[in-house]
Amino acid sequence: MSDYKNTLNLPETGFPMRGDLAKREPDMLKRWYEQDLYGIIRAAKKGKKTFILHDGPPYANGNIHIGHSVNKILKDIIVKSKGMAGYDSPYIPGWDCHGLPIELKVEQLIGKPGEKVSAAEFRTACRKYAAEQVEGQKKDFIRLGVLGDWDHPYLTMDFKTEANIIRALSKIIDNGHLHKGAKPVHWCTDCGSSLAEAEVEYYDKTSQSIDVRFNAVDTATVAAKFGVSAVNGPISLVIWTTTPWTLPANRAISLNAEYLYQLVQVEGECLILAADLVESVMKRAGITQWAVLGSCTGSDLELLRFTHPFMGFDVPAILGDHVTLDAGTGAVHTAPGHGPDDFVIGQKYGLEVANPVGPNGCYLAGTYPTLDGLFVFKANDVVVELLREKGALLHVEKLLHSYPCCWRHKTPIIFRATPQWFISMDQKGLRKQSLQEIKGVQWIPDWGQARIETMVANRPDWCISRQRTWGVPMSLFVHKETEQLHPRSIELMEEVAKRVEQDGIQAWWDLDPAEILGADAADYVKVPDTLDVWFDSGSTHSSVVDVRPEFGGHSPDMYLEGSDQHRGWFMSSLMIATAMKGKAPYRQVLTHGFTVDGQGRKMSKSIGNTISPQDVMNKLGGDILRLWVASTDYTGEIAVSDEILKRSADSYRRIRNTARFLLANLNGFDPAQHQVKPEEMVVVDRWAVGRAQAAQAEIMEAYENYDFHLVVQRLMQFCSVEMGSFYLDIIKDRQYTAKGDGIARRSCQTALFHIAEALVRWMAPIMSFTADEIWNHLPGERQQYVFTEEWYDGLFGLAGNESMNDTFWAELLKVRGEVNKVLEQARSDKRIGGSLEAAVTLYAEPELAARLNSLQDELRFVLLTSAAKVAAYADAGNDAQQSELIAGLKITFNKADGEKCPRCWHYTQDVGLVAEHAELCGRCVTNVAGDGEERKFA
């Protein structure tokens, strides 16, 4: 028996079956870096329309976690897909480098500034620490396959950026948005500083809930408001609070103008309570006997005076919409120095903003004899006892409720009125303009718009000052007596900015005011405050994007961060850009959810369900992590577990196997010489290229809409269903057995070439390492990297008016599936070995029969059987099986007649008819010794 193996066109490629990504990817990264891949892309895209995704800077502290990976990979997919779509999309990664978390780390290392080290030494240590953290995170981000200008990232602590942050503030001041005021701000007594809204977290805390009597100054006047002429005992307005420590700062009692209040007689006294809450107050106070003497509205009681239970002065009843009937008594203790609602209503009534609490959370001297120097949360018990002694305590109980805490220390915070600098929301119409700007932005998903609109509509003025060491200085001079800004503030800030651009923020603290103020130095002092770090990152559209030459003066197209950034970076950027430039800093804002485990639980070290991106890359490789990110609908929570990653690895293998099949069967194909013209190609080959064309249209649209999970789904459908289980299966016979350079094989290779050219581009934004590997194994002259390319424009398909159009092949796919079911059953029953042992008869209704017959003798190649014929549906015998999917089709089979050809494995009657090739079938003889078989359809 002759060996005909060397007459076959066996698949061959250097592209390995196993990805071995964890081992191979680092070598690819080395090559990308050494050859300056990012620079090559920029050169290739120069002059194209731009798309700027501006990187929200992660904080330069600690290792990257799985959430960081999701964020950076999503950004990279967008940047690369925009490149494919014909854009120049530069990506400059950034880091947020100032602020409290870094200060705390450095304090642990060298102590607090002003103790063991000077403030200047402390800042130097902070800068060094932040730089080290940046380098550590950078390595991991690069390992993810994220392409960017990693050698020239932006850092908020770059001298030039620090200077530009000062310039951003200067512009906001020039536009009239800054004001100074004593205002209650979130204050952490451990930090000794105010906190931004985004730095506040809520945890459950047990507090003392108290009902307190404030006695009426003029009993008769108050009684008359209720239509009562005489009462038994004093009248008191009862307030409710869960912060007894704030009572020394009480300056009023707030009522709701529209609520009904009742004067209630209890034993020896009268209480004023909201009518709807009388019963609940009586119940908790243990009062069983009472009588309602009269009623009036809150507005009737406005400006009546009541005595503070222990501070020795009286306070007014005032009206506010913030008073509700959810809990309490309907009367709210009001301390303008300790609450934003209290402050707002206090301004309306001209109340004193009392602030008896120091930065360390202890009462100042002169507050009250038994309270002076006491920490506020320890003072709660003292205040309750004081109220009890004074006969003012109606009731006390423990209450578990959600309470604001410092994100860093996890300890309860307070509202404390401090002299601070604010960007006003309403002084120059910033709120109104921001709300208008939001409408012009595309929010993805669209619920982001309502979310940020609500936040902007309800947010207080933005306190931008901090009392910290490591931060950008506000760079302001104020008058020693009036505390007014220097009239030349804008000019002076530019002078400071120039110095900071040369020497960094230390230049401000080293600056002798006389150097730039001259004679005014005697009357003006430097403001010691630093800027909120959210101002640093929120101004990067100006301090970075506007000045980096790569961006060519274009403003950002997209911001992309986690959904917590509506109140963080998206908000601060919107406020600053609108205050500076009168417009939003972005055109699109895309948000992704947080990572959770396979059961939907938050990632937590204590539960032990965290997954480290470093571990995944070291075990499975970066492309598996990237494919997992792309496969997930990122608009909700993003689930990750070993099982989920294993599924991504399985999907990856299917895609890789498809790519390998394409490459292996392009063996010996030179696209410059061997391409077959579309009109001369076998019909099924044109169909396959057409399926790639249809898939590409959907994939391009999904990339355009940032629906990456749909990209992956379509990619999988194309590889597994259209290619893997149909086309790639049926071409094996032609690919392996047809004449090597005959048109039947070259037609097939032409299709595979076009499909591979398209597929590698679809993959590149997501599975970047593998796409690069495929690119280097594709035949033909090409650019060095797939990442400089655009979507493949060489695809074509079948015309709709052809008889064998897409509809025809879609039906044939179904027919083949039905035949497979019959043959699979026969295999299970051991009636046949492989499908080539079968000769199939398809009994079909006339129209279907005509379509099947149009394939002539090539129907068998589609069905992968040695013979196939079509007969009338009515002629089907009892042994024919009715198709489940196609009403007018029945199927039967027999064992194929003839002998098995050892070369193509088909059973035919013409094996051995040619003496020189006595073992071969006629088709194989033509392919081995003749001009090669002719195929028209399949």
Swiss-Prot record:
A motif ('KMSKS' region) lies at residues 602-606. GO terms for cellular component: cytosol. Binds 1 zinc ion per subunit. InterPro entries: aa-tRNA-synth_I_CS, aa-tRNA-synth_Ia, Anticodon_Ile_BEm, Ile-tRNA-ligase, Ile-tRNA-ligase_type1, Ile-tRNA_ligase, M/V/L/I-tRNA-synth_anticd-bd, Rossmann-like_a/b/a_fold. L-isoleucyl-5'-AMP binds at residue 561. It is found in: Cytoplasm. Keywords: Aminoacyl-tRNA synthetase, ATP-binding, Cytoplasm, Ligase, Metal-binding, Nucleotide-binding, Protein biosynthesis, Zinc. ATP binds at residue 605. The keyword ATP-binding applies. Zn(2+) binds at residues 901, 904, 921, 924. It is an enzyme of class 6 (ligase). Its EC number is 6.1.1.5. GO terms for biological process: isoleucyl-tRNA aminoacylation. Its cofactor is Zn(2+). A motif ('HIGH' region) lies at residues 58-68. GO terms for molecular function: aminoacyl-tRNA deacylase activity; ATP binding; isoleucine-tRNA ligase activity; tRNA binding; zinc ion binding. Signal peptide: none annotated. Coiled coil: none annotated. CDD domains: Anticodon_Ia_Ile_BEm, IleRS_core. It catalyses: tRNA(Ile) + L-isoleucine + ATP = L-isoleucyl-tRNA(Ile) + AMP + diphosphate. Monomer. Catalyzes the attachment of isoleucine to tRNA(Ile). As IleRS can inadvertently accommodate and process structurally similar amino acids such as valine, to avoid such errors it has two additional distinct tRNA(Ile)-dependent editing activities. One activity is designated as 'pretransfer' editing and involves the hydrolysis of activated Val-AMP. The other activity is designated 'posttransfer' editing and involves deacylation of mischarged Val-tRNA(Ile). Belongs to the class-I aminoacyl-tRNA synthetase family. IleS type 1 subfamily. IleRS has two distinct active sites: one for aminoacylation and one for editing. The misactivated valine is translocated from the active site to the editing site, which sterically excludes the correctly activated isoleucine. The single editing site contains two valyl binding pockets, one specific for each substrate (Val-AMP or Val-tRNA(Ile)). This is Isoleucine--tRNA ligase. The lineage of its organism: Bacteria, Pseudomonadati, Pseudomonadota, Gammaproteobacteria, Enterobacterales. The gene is ileS.
